């Protein structure tokens, strides 16, 4: 169910030369954002600054541009690179189930010896475990702003906290590395207890902001 239903007239298809953008972020490599805008509409989202570059005047979270690009013909071009999917949108926002643009880019990158990082708040990422497991280096990076789902629902329209934690467990059990970012908020005090108790050598990392 889409919690933040965007009006059909505010969803548009846009053609782009490439979905691969050379990143200026400290992580380097490439950024991939299959959408402009994000229906999760997080009140604290830093990505709303993107409106300056897209000409959108609508409030963040009330529009969605669906990107279409020329398919990647040589995935090996990105060998040795870090590719971050979802730096200024959530590639697994609810409309991904309809448009499948994130799954499409994962298909096009098959065979690349690249480090893939997925940034998401959605359990829809579980749909693509079959593709994610084919990459040698892949991490799913989650953010959790609270363990109180009533508070969470007031802050964003993403998956519930329970759904996120269950999805994190499934991603981990599938052998995929994951990170969990948390905001500095008293209601997050027990996040380390809630996450699976695993040895220090585990592929789960929790960090605070």
Report the location of each language-model feature:
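Charged helix-capping and loop-helix junction motifs
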Residues: 99-103, 159-162, 190-199
